[in-house]
Amino acid sequence: MRPQELLLLLLMLKWSLAHTEDPAFPHLGDSSQPLPRPCPWRCSCPRDDTVDCAGLDLRIFPDNITRAARHLSLQNNQLRELPYNELSRLSGLRTLDLHSNLITSEGLPDEAFESLNQLENFYVAHNKLSVAPQFLPRSLRVADLAANEVVEIFPLTFGEKPALRSVYLHNNRLRNTGLPPNTFHGSEVITTLSLSSNQLSYLPPSLPASLERLHLQNNLISKVPRGALSLQTHLRELYLQHNQLTDSGLDATTFSKLSSLEYLDLSHNQLATVPEGLPGTLTILHLGRNCIRHVEAVRLHKARGLRYLLLQHNKLGASALPKGTLRPLRALHTLHLYGNKLERVPPALPRHLQALVMPHNHVAALGARDLVSARALAELNLAYNSLASAHVHPSAFRRLRALRSLDLAGNQLTRLPEGLPASLRSLRLQRNQLRTLEPEQLAGLNKLRELNLAHNRLRVGDIGPGTWHELQALKVLDLSHNELSFVPPDLPEALEELYLQANRISHVGPEAFLSTPHLRALFLRANRLHMTSIRAEALQGLTHLRVVDTAENPEQVLV
């Protein structure tokens, strides 16, 4: 090297070093500061592999998306189509979210997916697709095409996907003709399939054997073909409610092979009997709103693990549940019989039953032993039946020592039942014909927190002295819509909410609430109060009071 060239090289090196250390030019020598991350306009890129363009009202696919993107969010925009060139170059995508756009099938090029050979999560729900993509990548794990207008699926839409676990197709327009027999061929680990709210007329054949959750509610299904559910031994939840199933559309083997089934919903169909072949693993059986008139014990004898049996709104009459029908159900926790035509409590209730819910029936009597077998009952609802005090045995409730909630609203009771258990927390007796309250009727209820006596015929003079004495835990007392002329005296000290609306109260004296220092809410609307009917001293000691309702009285009341 010639001396002149060497001198020039040394001068250049010196200049470079000087400017590298110059604080005025930190970007020239500071390698710790990364170059600006490429990101589409208005979008955010919180990480090198994430591009978030959600909710920007975009009408065209954004440009300048880095090839390094693994997660692309475009949901909640106005996109109608995806350009093949832009999408196909993003070959490293793992997640593509197109939820809630205006994308049509014509605007979603099948060819683009051939390049997305690492795509795992594909969300295109709430768009305008009329057919599914003919091909989706083999790498797919989750596919959500719900809430479109899809009428046809293709063999390679969901077939040959060894990693696919969840498919969502609910709220489309699928008929059975739009599902090829090999829809899920080669996809052997699918655990969740949602086909609800379509137009299927029978249960599709060749469903994946790996299924754990199958949603078929809100279709037109009238039949489950024989063997359609013979391989789904992992199925835990099956939803068939709101269809058109009849007894002839099921047979003894329909559910018998489902050896893992825990939840079966057949409500809102046209079944006249309980289905045969129920598996022993079943925990919840929902048969509400069918046409069932009779329950045969043999139909339940294998379902020994059943904990919740829901039979509300059927046509169960006086002999619908003969003695012994429920005996095999030793684990039964809850029995729903709401809205039938039962005239008595079912005999021989399971001993571990904790909730018996049967309002809106025709029950007219309660005998001494009607509930004796269900000593574990914690909730008993017999509201809106035809119970009269004369036909409720004094010992009907006496042995229910775990009972916490008793609802007898809407019956024909003229007095409180005798023998109420001390364990009660809630007692509902509204809309009866109660005329008297005596201390003996509420004796021992020192755990009661809520007492509803609304819509009866109670007068203050018919409430015996000391009636409230033992209700030491009472927080809520509803005496609305009775015939009270003033606030009942000596109310429970723990009381926090007092409902006295729609009575005949015309005056509230200074001593009215001396016994209730913890009162938080007081309702006196629609009485006979005038401007100065409430003495100022009446409310002075109520430091916790937050609500005083005196509307709809003859005059505006000063409080």
Swiss-Prot record:
<feature type="repeat" description="LRR 8">
    <location>
        <begin position="233"/>
        <end position="257"/>
    </location>
</feature>
<comment type="similarity">
    <text>Belongs to the small leucine-rich proteoglycan (SLRP) family. SLRP class V subfamily.</text>
</comment>
<feature type="repeat" description="LRR 7">
    <location>
        <begin position="209"/>
        <end position="231"/>
    </location>
</feature>
<feature type="repeat" description="LRR 16">
    <location>
        <begin position="425"/>
        <end position="444"/>
    </location>
</feature>
<feature type="repeat" description="LRR 15">
    <location>
        <begin position="400"/>
        <end position="423"/>
    </location>
</feature>
<feature type="repeat" description="LRR 17">
    <location>
        <begin position="445"/>
        <end position="470"/>
    </location>
</feature>
<protein>
    <recommendedName>
        <fullName>Podocan-like protein 1</fullName>
    </recommendedName>
</protein>
<keyword id="KW-0964">Secreted</keyword>
<keyword id="KW-0272">Extracellular matrix</keyword>
<feature type="repeat" description="LRR 20">
    <location>
        <begin position="517"/>
        <end position="541"/>
    </location>
</feature>
<feature type="signal peptide">
    <location>
        <begin position="1"/>
        <end position="20"/>
    </location>
</feature>
<feature type="repeat" description="LRR 9">
    <location>
        <begin position="258"/>
        <end position="281"/>
    </location>
</feature>
<feature type="repeat" description="LRR 10">
    <location>
        <begin position="283"/>
        <end position="302"/>
    </location>
</feature>
<dbReference type="GO" id="GO:0005576">
    <property type="term" value="C:extracellular region"/>
</dbReference>
<dbReference type="InterPro" id="IPR050333">
    <property type="entry name" value="SLRP"/>
</dbReference>
<dbReference type="InterPro" id="IPR001611">
    <property type="entry name" value="Leu-rich_rpt"/>
</dbReference>
<feature type="repeat" description="LRR 4">
    <location>
        <begin position="140"/>
        <end position="160"/>
    </location>
</feature>
<keyword id="KW-0433">Leucine-rich repeat</keyword>
<keyword id="KW-0732">Signal</keyword>
<keyword id="KW-0325">Glycoprotein</keyword>
<feature type="repeat" description="LRR 3">
    <location>
        <begin position="117"/>
        <end position="139"/>
    </location>
</feature>
<feature type="repeat" description="LRR 1">
    <location>
        <begin position="66"/>
        <end position="89"/>
    </location>
</feature>
<feature type="repeat" description="LRR 11">
    <location>
        <begin position="303"/>
        <end position="328"/>
    </location>
</feature>
<dbReference type="Pfam" id="PF13855">
    <property type="entry name" value="LRR_8"/>
</dbReference>
<dbReference type="Pfam" id="PF00560">
    <property type="entry name" value="LRR_1"/>
</dbReference>
<feature type="repeat" description="LRR 14">
    <location>
        <begin position="374"/>
        <end position="399"/>
    </location>
</feature>
<dbReference type="InterPro" id="IPR032675">
    <property type="entry name" value="LRR_dom_sf"/>
</dbReference>
<dbReference type="GO" id="GO:0062023">
    <property type="term" value="C:collagen-containing extracellular matrix"/>
</dbReference>
<dbReference type="InterPro" id="IPR003591">
    <property type="entry name" value="Leu-rich_rpt_typical-subtyp"/>
</dbReference>
<feature type="repeat" description="LRR 13">
    <location>
        <begin position="354"/>
        <end position="373"/>
    </location>
</feature>
<feature type="repeat" description="LRR 18">
    <location>
        <begin position="471"/>
        <end position="494"/>
    </location>
</feature>
<feature type="repeat" description="LRR 2">
    <location>
        <begin position="90"/>
        <end position="115"/>
    </location>
</feature>
<feature type="repeat" description="LRR 19">
    <location>
        <begin position="496"/>
        <end position="515"/>
    </location>
</feature>
<feature type="repeat" description="LRR 6">
    <location>
        <begin position="188"/>
        <end position="208"/>
    </location>
</feature>
<feature type="repeat" description="LRR 5">
    <location>
        <begin position="161"/>
        <end position="186"/>
    </location>
</feature>
<keyword id="KW-0677">Repeat</keyword>
<feature type="glycosylation site" description="N-linked (GlcNAc...) asparagine">
    <location>
        <position position="64"/>
    </location>
</feature>
<feature type="repeat" description="LRR 12">
    <location>
        <begin position="329"/>
        <end position="352"/>
    </location>
</feature>
